[in-house]
Amino acid sequence: GINVLSDKPMAINSQSFKLLEECFAIAKQKNIMLYDIMTERNEITTMLQRELSTIPAVYGEQLKGSPEEPAIVKESVHHLFKLVDNKPLTRPVWYLDVNQQGEGIVDVTTHLVDLVQWEAFPDQIIDYKKDIELIDANRWTTSISPEEFKQVTGTDAYPDFLKKDVENDTLKVYCNGDIVYKIKGVTAKVSVIWNYTFPKGGGDTHFSVMKGSKADLVIRQGKEQNYQPELFVEAVKGVDLAAYEKDLTASMEKVSAEYPGVALNKVGDGVWQVEIPAKYRVGHEAHFGQVTEHFLDYLKEGKLPDWEVPNMLAKYYTTTSALDMAKAKK
């Protein structure tokens, strides 16, 4: 058998989820590893958000939330056409075929669902049969004109396999989706939106919040942050701010022992920005190398951490069941 380090998504619908379960069973039997590439766990703002959420003096207890007010939210906005190193990014034509790439609700959401699990339940096993409860799921299309199609793929005409998604010359791709669900009793929401492109000076955006009884840990990546993710600690109403600031400052000293240079900057009443030195912002491409290093360590040890396989299954169960739920809506 072959050890496999796979790009996400490993499953894009319920059928492939069943197949994935079989693959994990075979891997276990043959003592080989099957692992997906979760680059976003190596993004520094996410690592620090996770770290701070494990410190009761900073975070308090994880709130349970509700469908109207989820206690964990992760939303990202991506763009089909963009410049990478000042050159237009050309995407393969099949990238726009949901039967090959997967719909948005089962593609990039894989990362967001992974982070909900990894941050809120670190090193804990999640059993999808009893720990996951879907509440709501939606999917919708992004329209791409023939000119835009040519610009992003470099191809003149829609191939036959995309004709199913063309209406009046416009390609409609189901690349957007959101999922509201409960994981071990905590209500979470993930959402992925793909627009065609962004206005000049714009970029991909990300928003994430984890809500604790003492503070919200918020990642913002928007215009104000120059499209670079930044982490904020926002004390909840009713907290004694003077006492909280002492606790937060003391806790940050422990964090900066592990991440030298990371510091707090008070930006408002009960609001602090976590200052992150540039050396920690290694960029998306470097994360692939970091994931590979982890995988090679696991190969040396001869096993994945106990929680990884059940949690991969929980993750793909969540995304593929959400697709079924969203498709069932008319």
Region locations from a protein language model:
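Beta-strand-loop-alpha-helix segment that lines the small-molecule cofactor/substrate pocket
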Residues: 1-41
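Glycine- and acidic
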Residues: 5-6, 36, 79, 95-102, ...
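Conserved structured core elements
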Residues: 14-18, 43, 110, 173, ...
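Short secondary-structure boundary/capping segments
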Residues: 21, 50-57, 224-228
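Hydrophobic residues in alpha-helical segments
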Residues: 24-28, 53, 299-302
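Predominantly a Rossmann-like dinucleotide-binding segment in NAD(P)-dependent oxidoreductases
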Residues: 29-36, 40-168, 295, 329
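C-terminal helical cap and adjacent loop that interface with cofactors, partners, or active-site loops
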Residues: 107, 112, 116-117, 124, ...
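Contiguous C-terminal substrate-recognition/catalytic subdomains in enzyme active sites
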Residues: 167-170, 224
